[in-house]
Amino acid sequence: MKRSPFRRSRTRGAAAVEFALVLMPMIVLATGVAEFGRAIYQYETLTKATRDAARYLSIWLPTDSAYPVSAAQCLVVYGSTTCGSAGTELVPGLTTSMVTICDASHTTGCGDASDPSQFSNLPTYDANNNAASGTATGAINVVEVKVKGYTYQPIPAYPGLMSITFGNIITVMRQVS
């Protein structure tokens, strides 16, 4: 019995075509996931930077003549209390003008709905579950560090993807008084 010569199948190359059809949506999906992760990373970096600056300012009296507002702004932007041309921003596009410091003595730019109603002489209450119906036992001062108007710029892999402006990123901590 004689075998017929090898015949090429009609399905030859079908896997390559299927792979090509699936590859582009998979690349777009993977890049989108990476871009979303990058946005979350930048948001968390800003949150941690405001926390560091609020912690730094919490040991200073707001009435101190050496109160380091500009150093705290540099701490948010550069991760260091000194601003310099050699420093790189923690996140691209962040400037010290986007950082607002609010406390008992500095209230410019502190009138947003997300801000506390007051920064000095906040009453503290007894052990009645911190309810305002308890007896006031003292007062504290707070300091707020806020990043306002930061715009996240996506990587240029998506030409149609628009930039995102984050909401106010705020940290409030108790301050010495």
Predicted regions: what they are:
Residues 2-78:
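Alpha-helical assembly-interface signal, strongest on the long, hydrophobic N-terminal helix that forms
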Residues 2-3, 51-177:
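Short, conserved structural patches
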